[in-house]
């Protein structure tokens, strides 16, 4: 199989762009997609995002997290540089940890319409407590809906040893 042609990537504008603009306000419109060349196969795509930051909506203090985004694509896939810039746009966004994870998941569902997706944030402790919100989605009426239920019930059965992240 030959690699992707330039015409296949016409909607991917941020990758390789040396004039990248970093947006400091929540910007879902920066997300870009490309076609999944393997839509007849189930497979996971996982992003490990260790530099996520947002702001506490009450105090304005920064929150830091590693975010794990895993999804099973259908027809469209998120382009990784646009995802990086999108996550960066949360830098000055004031929202609770749980809200940030659900907003990210909802934006990616709207963008890609994946078969399945999960977003897990592992935030560094503040005030001696770390918060690790997990959300997922499986396309209704399909095996992915059942998969989402199963993974929700079993996603964190083994407590981790916290070493201050």
UniProtKB/Swiss-Prot annotation:
Write out the catalysed reaction: 7-aminomethyl-7-carbaguanine + 2 NADP(+) = 7-cyano-7-deazaguanine + 2 NADPH + 3 H(+)
GO molecular function terms attached to this record? preQ1 synthase activity
Which domain of life, per UniProt? Bacteria
Question: What Gene3D superfamilies does the entry give?
Answer: 3.30.1130.10
Q: Record's Gene Ontology CC terms?
A: cytoplasm
Keywords in alphabetical order: Cytoplasm, NADP, Oxidoreductase, Queuosine biosynthesis
State where it is primarily located.
cytoplasm
Q: In which pathway does it act?
A: tRNA modification; tRNA-queuosine biosynthesis
Give the enzyme's EC designation: 1.7.1.13
Q: Where in the cell is it found?
A: Cytoplasm
Enumerate the active-site residues.
56 (thioimide intermediate), 63 (proton donor)
Record has Transferase as a keyword: no
- Any idea which positions bind substrate? 78-80, 97-98
GO biological process terms on file: queuosine biosynthetic process; tRNA modification
The family classification in the record reads: Belongs to the GTP cyclohydrolase I family. QueF type 1 subfamily.
NCBIfam families, from UniProt? QueF-II
- Briefly state the protein's biological role: Catalyzes the NADPH-dependent reduction of 7-cyano-7-deazaguanine (preQ0) to 7-aminomethyl-7-deazaguanine (preQ1).
Instruction: Return the HAMAP family for the record.
Output: QueF_type1
Protein's name in the database: NADPH-dependent 7-cyano-7-deazaguanine reductase
- Species of origin: Bacillus anthracis
**Gene that codes for this?**
queF
């Amino acid at each position: 199989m030959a690699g992707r042609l330039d015409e296949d990537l016409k909607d991917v504008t941020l990758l390789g762009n040396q004039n990248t603009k970093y947006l400091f306000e929540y910007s879902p419109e920066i997300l870009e997609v490309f076609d999944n060349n393997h839509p007849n196969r189930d497979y996971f795509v996982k992003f490990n995002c260790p530099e996520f930051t947002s702001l506490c909506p009450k105090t304005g203090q920064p929150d830091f997290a590693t975010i794990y985004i895993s999804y099973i694509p259908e027809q469209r896939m998120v382009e990784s540089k646009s995802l990086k810039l999108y996550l960066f746009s949360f830098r000055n966004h004031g929202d609770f940890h749980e809200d940030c994870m659900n907003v990210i998941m909802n934006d990616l569902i709207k963008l890609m319409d994946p078969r399945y997706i999960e977003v897990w944030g592992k935030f560094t402790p503040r005030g001696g407590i770390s918060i690790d919100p997990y959300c997922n989605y499986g396309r209704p009426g399909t095996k992915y809906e059942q998969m989402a239920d199963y993974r929700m019930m079993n996603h964190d059965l083994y407590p981790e040893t916290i070493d201050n992240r």
